[in-house]
């Protein structure tokens, strides 16, 4: 099998295209009788490093990305659940207003002072629930299909939450198709009579083609038939093909390249018409008018269909096999850095019916599952690509390629709504890829707004963004269709979708990536002027030709020697360019090294200064610590020396006393005592003195400990702070009672005086009745006063009972203190007896603790005479108040 891989030019349909010189990856193999041998078979790669032409972006290239919004109608079940709360409102053709409903997170955040309850978004155009599929297609996608037929690449992707109508917008139903079947119908209706009959050129990589021989063409047709038949094995198809070829050879018909394809096409039509005719009525009368296309161009249409499920790529048009596990595909890059899906099946289609059937086959292989919001939700990103090869002439020129990709993005949904592990994993991968897409769009917008500081666009963080990379970076254009669910329960997700689309609507289409490669004719012309004077005349004769004719001239018109000369000239230019680039690289390296050396020097200087400052700070800190340590040591040793001096003075004083005693003893003693006895007595006295000193030190230590215990017990004897308020209240009540007693005493004195005056009056007057009345009133007054006094005395009794309890507790503590003091005094007396040999003296008696704190009132016997007059007389005899008949002993 021999094959050649060709990369198409970009200037076959329009004279305004800048790209003229094609890029060839591999043409070393012989392609047989079908492929021309002189198609640059002597050079493997044609490249140039001449100065690229500066491309001035036109107004079309600076056009913003189209973002369309479509609102789906509410279902009857949703109306029954009261989902229609007016949260999605279309203000005009370009403005959408979102009002947060009750129970939504946005409204709760607004009540807490975070966010807004009303949001307003602007789109390219908004379509309400009443807009049908045909109107939506004519107003949005029809112009894009027209651009694709002219050679432009377009990406159309739908975005929205689950159950918002994305798949319905892309595919539609059998009766009312979406933008994908209508795009296929419009493409094939516009290209009627201009389709290339044989699939001898097949798309490869990102924007290249490969030439197929007859065997490879049969394999492609068998692959398509196996997909359309839905399980027919390739062996059966190959036997039917061999049988048809044998019959044609028996009747004398020569099997040519075209006839084999025609026969295979007829077989495929017969087979597919019997098995998949359920949608044949859809394409019988298309409702789309054809678009004008150039008449001198033929077209070859290829389709592919794959999905991205859990960040893995699967081919949805893979032929059926016995293996249950699907084969994963790899996402690679070609030599120009353009991403492509390796081993992806590209199927050649002749009409829209075949494309629609292949779409249905791919839909059967797609990943679907039931979610919280949709019973049949697609859990993967599916991408359906239509690649059109634009062929001019007899097929001996490398074709131009245009592509229309329609992507049905999986719906975003909250992960907390997914209960099972598989659905949770799917939702996480879907949200991750959509989040990466949002990051890429935000980075592209920031780079377009701030061209001085370009940020890295994270295309490689997700498979989806790597597939979209070419359309976002100038290899094509993109369009977003936002589908909105007007239900109130999905308002928060709808708001997130609207914010995402608002960022995408600010993007500007990147200018096309066109490299200003010069034409091959310019190389030959320039080289002929420099090298061969004989070719100068021919070059001057060709100067009158038009530049477009030169760019589109056939390569076969040049001889082998001229092409070799061109190769040599290109080699010299390449060497020269490499030398210049090497010099530039060396210059840049020198500059970078110098800058790095300067930075290192600055860094070293800063580090040295920092070290010096740190060293000074550490020296100061440790000097302060040393000074503090010196001061503490000097003070400590001074105290030790002072204590030692005091002890020495005490010992010297004791020694002097002992000497004085010894001298006095010697004087009082007999002079006839022997010197030896004096020495023994002196030594014994010194020993006793030392023992007494030791005991004295021990007694002092015990005295200190006992004094400390005494202080503790004194603190314990003090009333607790919790009892202070109670004692204060008792004192206040006692003072009030004493005041009342004083008042009552004054009243009694007044009453006594009145009684005395009454007695005097009784002596002079004969009105005994008046005197009796006065006595009765006085008795009543005295009774009342006695009652008040009784109440006061009862209160005082209660207070004194409480005080007695506290006094008992204090007395117990006082006895313990006395015992301890007795022990201490006994130890002191023992020490003084041993030292001075004096008789024990009793310590002065101490007054009992709190003996006079609560003086008792003297008791008095109740008088037998309880008449009011007797009580008045007793009160007159004593100035102090005596207890009445209600007095008690306490």
Swiss-Prot record:
The keyword Cytoplasm applies. InterPro entries: KIF11-like (IPR047149), Kinesin_motor_CS (IPR019821), Kinesin_motor_dom (IPR001752), Kinesin_motor_dom_sf (IPR036961), P-loop_NTPase (IPR027417). Residues 763-890 are annotated as: Globular. The modification Phosphothreonine is found at residue 857. Residues 64-507 form the Kinesin motor domain. Residues 611-762 form a coiled coil. GO terms for molecular function: ATP binding; ATP hydrolysis activity; microtubule binding; microtubule motor activity; protein kinase binding. The modification N-acetylserine is found at residue 2. ATP binds at residues 160-167. CDD domains: KISc_KIF23_like, RBD_KIF20A. Changing residue 182 to W: In RCM6; loss-of-function variant unable to rescue cardiac defects in zebrafish morphants; results in greatly reduced microtubule activated motor activity; does not localize to the spindle midzone. GO terms for cellular component: cleavage furrow; cytoplasm; Golgi apparatus; intercellular bridge; kinesin complex; microtubule; midbody; mitotic spindle. It is linked to Cardiomyopathy, familial restrictive 6: A heart disorder characterized by impaired filling of the ventricles with reduced diastolic volume, in the presence of normal or near normal wall thickness and systolic function. RCM6 is an autosomal recessive, severe form characterized by prenatal onset, irreversible heart failure and early death. This is Kinesin-like protein KIF20A. It comes from Homo sapiens (Human). The gene is KIF20A.
């Amino acid at each position: 099998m021999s094959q050649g891989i060709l990369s198409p030019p970009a200037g076959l349909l329009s004279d305004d295209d800048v790209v003229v010189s094609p890029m060839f990856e591999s043409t070393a193999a012989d392609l047989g009788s079908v492929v021309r041998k002189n198609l640059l078979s002597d050079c493997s790669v044609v490249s140039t490093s001449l100065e690229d032409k500066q491309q001035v972006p036109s107004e079309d290239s600076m056009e913003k990305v189209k973002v369309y919004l479509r609102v789906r109608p509410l279902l009857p079940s949703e109306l029954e659940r009261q989902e229609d709360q007016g949260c999605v409102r279309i203000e005009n053709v370009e403005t959408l207003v979102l009002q947060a409903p009750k129970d939504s997170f946005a409204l709760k955040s607004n009540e807490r002072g975070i966010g807004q309850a009303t949001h307003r978004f602007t789109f390219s155009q908004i379509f309400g629930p009443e807009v049908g599929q045909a109107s939506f297609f004519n107003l949005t996608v029809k112009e894009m299909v027209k651009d694709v037929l002219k050679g432009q690449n377009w990406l159309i992707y739908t975005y929205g939450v689950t159950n918002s109508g994305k798949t319905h917008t892309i595919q539609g139903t059998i009766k009312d198709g979406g933008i994908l079947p209508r795009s296929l119908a419009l493409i094939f209706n516009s290209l009627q009579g201009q389709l290339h009959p044989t699939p001898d050129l097949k798309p490869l990589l990102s924007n290249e083609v490969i030439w197929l021989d007859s065997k490879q063409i049969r394999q492609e047709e068998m692959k398509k038939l196996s997909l359309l038949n839905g399980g027919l094995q390739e062996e059966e198809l190959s036997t039917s093909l061999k049988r048809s070829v044998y019959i044609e050879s028996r009747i004398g018909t020569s099997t040519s390249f075209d006839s084999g394809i025609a026969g295979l096409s007829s077989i495929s039509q017969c087979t597919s018409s019997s098995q998949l005719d359920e949608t044949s009525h859809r394409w019988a009368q298309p409702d789309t008018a054809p678009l004008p296309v150039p008449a001198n161009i033929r077209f070859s249409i290829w389709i592919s269909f794959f999905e991205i499920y859990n960040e893995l790529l699967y081919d949805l048009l893979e032929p059926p096999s016995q293996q249950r596990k699907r084969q994963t595909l790899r996402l690679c890059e070609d030599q120009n850095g353009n991403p492509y899906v390796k081993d992806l099946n590209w199927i050649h289609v002749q009409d829209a019916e075949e494309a629609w059937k292949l779409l249905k086959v791919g839909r059967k292989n797609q990943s679907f599952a039931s979610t919280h919001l949709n019973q049949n939700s697609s859990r993967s990103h599916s991408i359906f690509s239509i690649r059109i090869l634009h062929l001019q002439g007899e097929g001996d020129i490398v074709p131009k390629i245009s592509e229309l990709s329609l992507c049905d993005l999986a719906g975003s949904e909250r992960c907390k709504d997914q209960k099972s592990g598989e659905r949770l994993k799917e939702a996480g991968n879907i949200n991750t890829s959509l989040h990466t897409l949002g990051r890429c769009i935000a980075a592209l917008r920031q780079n377009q707004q701030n061209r001085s500081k370009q940020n890295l666009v994270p295309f490689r963080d997700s498979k989806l963004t790597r597939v979209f990379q070419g359309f976002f970076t100038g290899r094509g254009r993109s369009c977003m269709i936002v589908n909105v669910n007007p239900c109130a329960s999905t308002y928060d997700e709808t708001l997130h979708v609207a914010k995402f689309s608002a960022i995408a609507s600010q993007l500007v289409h990147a200018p096309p990536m066109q490299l200003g490669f010069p034409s091959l004719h310019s190389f030959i012309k320039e080289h002929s002027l420099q090298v061969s004077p004989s070719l100068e005349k021919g070059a001057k004769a060709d100067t009158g030709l038009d530049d477009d004719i030169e760019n589109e001239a056939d390569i076969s018109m040049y001889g082998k020697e001229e092409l070799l000369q061109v190769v040599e000239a290109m080699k010299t230019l390449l060497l020269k360019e490499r030398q210049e680039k090497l010099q530039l690289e060396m210059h840049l390296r020198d500059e970078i090294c110098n800058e790095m050396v300067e930075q290192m020097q600055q860094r070293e200087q800063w580090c040295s200064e920092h070290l010096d400052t740190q060293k000074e700070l550490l020296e100061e800190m440790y000097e302060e610590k040393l000074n503090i340590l010196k001061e503490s040591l000097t003070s400590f040793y001074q105290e030790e020396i002072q204590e030692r001096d005091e002890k020495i003075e005490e010992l010297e004083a004791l020694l002097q006393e002992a000497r004085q005693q010894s001298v006095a003893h010697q004087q009082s003693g007999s002079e006839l005592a022997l010197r030896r006895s004096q020495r023994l007595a002196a030594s014994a006295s010194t020993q006793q003195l030392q023992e007494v000193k030791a005991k004295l030190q021990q007694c002092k230590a015990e005295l200190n400990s006992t004094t400390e215990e005494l202080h503790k017990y004194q603190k314990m004897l003090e009333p607790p702070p919790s009892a202070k308020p109670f004692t204060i209240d008792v004192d206040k009540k006692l003072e009030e009672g004493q005041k009342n007693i004083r008042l009552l005493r004054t009243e009694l004195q007044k009453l006594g005086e009145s009684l005395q005056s009454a007695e005097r009056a009784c002596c002079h007057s004969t009105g005994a009745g008046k005197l009796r009345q006065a006595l009765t009133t006085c008795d009543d007054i005295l009774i009342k006063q006695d009652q008040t006094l009784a109440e006061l005395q009862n209160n005082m009794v209660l207070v004194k009972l409480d005080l007695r309890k506290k006094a008992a507790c204090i007395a117990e503590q006082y006895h313990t203190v006395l015992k301890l003091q007795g022990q201490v005094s006994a130890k002191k007396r023992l020490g003084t007896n041993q030292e001075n040999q004096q008789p024990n003296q009793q310590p002065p008696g101490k007054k009992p603790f709190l003996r006079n704190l609560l003086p008792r009132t003297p008791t008095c016997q109740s008088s037998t005479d309880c008449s009011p007059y007797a009580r008045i007389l007793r009160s007159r005899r004593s100035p102090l108040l005596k207890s009445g008949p209600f007095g008690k002993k306490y």
